[in-house]
UniProtKB/Swiss-Prot annotation:
The keyword Secreted applies. This is Nemertide alpha-2. It comes from Lineus longissimus. It comes from the Eukaryota. The lineage of its organism: Eukaryota, Metazoa, Spiralia, Lophotrochozoa, Nemertea. Confined to the epidermis and to the mucus layer.
């Protein structure tokens, strides 16, 4: 399944918007 937007937020990786299998995209952390 896919992780919902805003899930798994960390200071280092930011917020992941998609996580399906090996494909994932993370936005930069908010200042």
């Amino acid at each position: 399944g896919c992780i919902a937007t805003g899930s798994v937020c960390t200071l280092s990786k930011g917020c992941c918007t998609k996580n399906c299998g090996w494909n994932f995209k993370c936005n930069p952390p908010n200042q």
